[in-house]
């Protein structure tokens, strides 16, 4: 076993754009050999990938430290360990995921055709990763593509070049080179990739770039999964546990120095508890980083000067009052966690996703007002985080939309590796993780198989059409409504109970069994020898 280190690898280099069409052709041709479809092939790739990642763990830890200042602990928690567990989960469950499903909600007259759902791979796919979690957000979708039987090209983010070159090495050493390739680069290389025809594009990043990718994909009717972001609100009522709210929201916002698409972008807090909430935020900050964030080994850096400048400009443009933090250092890309009390929803800190350790607090006096404000700022954020009583949090969830939600926590839903994760509206489309990653790169193919003996029942579909056939057709296909002309339910209590207990399919079979039993009891001849 040889452990890989960063110094063992060549420097980051862009892929020549002239090489990109041949790379695309290579993975497309491989898919059409159908060799990526069998379970054995997929498992072989996943297992080889797992051990290559294990051997490259030191290099991956080094890379995330160099690119983002991440501690080894945080990198393992959110990157390396995450992907290793993802592969193990897929390996253990892949055979089950691949199995055909019996189609649900099929009428009795169609059951003889044995309708089922096959899980077919979509084809050759493109995965475009992001810099903030360069390993998880690149390799997570790739694991889904491999599991689904697709071939793939990965384009990691050029803003995390060290992680990108480690991933390229791992993939080249462990996966089938005819099926899985890496393209390095920035805008020119991404443009060249988008010039190719893919069977699916998976993109993680900003909404601005997501629109460009969606537009290019639409030209060839290529399906996309877009994992974007948004101005995610946390809503803290007067009944919330402020110590817990402060600790959980601060952790969510300081992870990766706030460069997390799903962390809260701002806090709507009941005006009566703002001073105490700020005090609890300060207390939690002191507990997390006793010597301060600048000296803390557990607090990273902003990824590059361009992003640091953007954050600094946001902070400079706010009309709010800085209550905590505010210290910065461009030379080291340090940006202190900064709590700002803002006066209204038009403040600069609430106009755009900060994607950094800025924590604006907007006071409210009425929960309905807070919900209205959150919807006005961004109607479809990636996440929403209500803190309060059950009644209050249920009210918030019932009157807002978001990709996901964590009640009384900061993005816990996004911390569960097997829970489907995705946006809604302009925070994204599609979902992945766990089984959803397999489904993301699979086509649910409906299949029937019509036996010859059923032809006499199918004569209703063949001309000439007669009144007799019409009566037969109605008898075979018409569904009786369970409501009257006034919209009232016509189901009796017993039927409602049976449906809730057995389900529609179960009730059908129960009725058939009862009819059969009655027939046998009444002396039906089954043609069986005694």
Regions found by a protein language model. Give the residues of each.
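N-terminal Rossmann-like NAD(P)+-binding subdomain of aldehyde/semialdehyde dehydrogenases
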Residues: 1-116, 492-501, 518-526
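ALDH superfamily catalytic-core signature
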Residues: 10-14, 175, 208-344, 407
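Conserved C-terminal structural/oligomerization subdomain of aldehyde/semialdehyde dehydrogenase
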Residues: 38-41, 334-530
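Residue-level signal for inorganic ion chemistry
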Residues: 42, 87, 149, 180, ...
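Short loop/edge segments at beta-strand edges and connector loops
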Residues: 184, 205, 324-326, 388
């Amino acid at each position: 076993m040889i452990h890989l280190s960063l110094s063992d690898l060549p420097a980051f280099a862009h892929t020549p754009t002239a090489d990109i069409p041949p790379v695309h052709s290579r993975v497309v041709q491989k898919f059409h050999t159908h060799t990526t479809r069998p379970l054995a092939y997929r498992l072989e790739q996943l297992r080889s990938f797992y051990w290559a990642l294990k051997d490259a763990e030191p290099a991956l830890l080094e890379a995330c430290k160099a690119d983002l200042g991440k501690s080894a602990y945080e990198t393992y928690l959110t990157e390396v360990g995450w992907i290793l567990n993802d592969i193990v989960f897929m390996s253990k469950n892949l055979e089950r995921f691949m199995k055909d499903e019996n189609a649900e909600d099929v009428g009795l007259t169609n059951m003889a055709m044995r309708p089922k759902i096959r899980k077919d791979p979509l084809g050759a796919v493109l995965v475009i990763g992001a810099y903030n979690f360069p390993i998880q957000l690149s390799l997570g979708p790739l694991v889904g593509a491999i599991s689904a039987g697709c071939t793939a090209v990965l384009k990691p983010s050029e803003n995390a070049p060290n992680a990108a070159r480690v991933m390229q090495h791992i993939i080249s050493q462990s996966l089938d080179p005819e099926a899985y390739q890496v393209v390095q680069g920035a805008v020119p290389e991404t443009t060249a990739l988008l010039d190719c025809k893919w069977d699916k594009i998976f993109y993680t990043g900003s909404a601005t770039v997501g629109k460009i990718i969606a537009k290019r994909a639409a030209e060839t009717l290529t399906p996309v999964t877009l994992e974007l972001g948004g101005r995610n609100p946390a809503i803290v009522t007067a009944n919330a546990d402020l110590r817990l709210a402060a600790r959980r929201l601060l952790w969510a916002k300081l992870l990766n120095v706030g460069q997390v698409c799903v962390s809260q972008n701002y806090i709507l807090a009941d005006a009566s508890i703002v001073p105490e909430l700020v005090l609890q935020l300060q207390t939690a900050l002191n507990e997390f980083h006793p010597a301060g964030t600048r000296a803390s080994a557990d607090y990273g850096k902003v990824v590059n000067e361009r992003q640091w400048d953007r954050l600094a400009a946001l902070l400079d443009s706010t009309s709010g009052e800085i209550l905590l933090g505010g210290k910065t250092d461009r030379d080291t890309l340090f940006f202190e966690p900064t709590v700002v009390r803002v006066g209204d929803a038009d403040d600069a800190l609430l106009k755009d996703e900060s994607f950094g350790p800025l924590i604006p607090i907007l006071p409210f006096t009425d929960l309905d007002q807070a919900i209205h404000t959150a919807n006005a700022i961004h109607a479809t954020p990636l996440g929403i985080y209500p803190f309060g009583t059950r009644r209050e949090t249920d009210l918030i969830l019932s009157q807002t939309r978001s990709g996901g939600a964590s009640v009384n926590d900061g993005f816990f839903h996004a911390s569960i590796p097997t829970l489907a994760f995705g946006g809604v509206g302009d925070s994204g489309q599609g979902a992945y993780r766990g089984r959803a990653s397999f489904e993301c790169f699979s086509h649910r193919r409906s299949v029937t198989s019509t036996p010859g003996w059923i032809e006499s029942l199918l004569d209703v579909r063949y001309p000439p059409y007669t009144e007799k056939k019409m009566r037969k057709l109605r008898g075979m296909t018409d569904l009786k409504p369970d409501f009257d002309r006034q919209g009232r339910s016509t189901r009796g209590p017993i039927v409602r109970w049976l449906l809730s207990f057995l389900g529609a399919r179960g009730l059908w079979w129960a009725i058939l069994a009862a009819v059969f039993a009655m027939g046998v009891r009444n002396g039906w001849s089954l043609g069986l020898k005694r």
